[in-house]
Design a protein with these regions (language model features):
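Gly/Ser-rich phosphate-binding catalytic loop and adjacent alpha/beta segment
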Residues: 2-131
């Protein structure tokens, strides 16, 4: 069965559309936090970074709320390159890293890219479980 939200490299789309809005970012935070919390028994850590799109500053609090509702300790790092977040996720032994970005898409888009504790992009299988 096809994935509902995740594309080839995370979730992307027009800000304030069907799945790129505060409500959905809360739900993605809650779902991903719940999944990763079951995968690691010690302190539950999620690290969030973003690119410099203005919409990231509006969407980030909803994502943090979802993650903390799932019992995660959240560190917000501010603007970072995507590969910097991947490295931090692994070196800080976090459960997960979430990058708020739409990569090369236009400025009016935004999205999420999730990394596992190894600092690598999530597998299709894990993305499907989070959905």
């Amino acid at each position: 069965m096809a994935k509902k939200y995740f594309g080839t490299d995370g979730i992307r789309g027009l800000v304030n559309s069907r799945h790129i809005n505060g409500d959905m970012f809360f739900k993605f935070g809650l779902a991903s936090g719940t999944y990763f919390k079951t995968q690691k028994k010690n302190k539950q850590i999620a690290i969030i970074a973003k690119d410099t799109r203005l919409s990231g500053y509006a969407l980030e609090p909803a994502l943090v709320s979802g993650l903390t509702s799932a019992g995660m300790h959240v560190y917000t790092m501010g603007p970072l390159p995507t590969n910097g977040l991947a490295m931090l996720t692994k070196s800080m032994k976090a459960n997960m890293g979430i990058m708020i970005t739409a990569s090369h898409n236009p400025h009016y888009d935004n999205g999420l890219k999730l990394f596992g504790p190894d600092g690598l992009k999530l597998s299709d299988k894990i993305e499907k479980k989070i959905e």
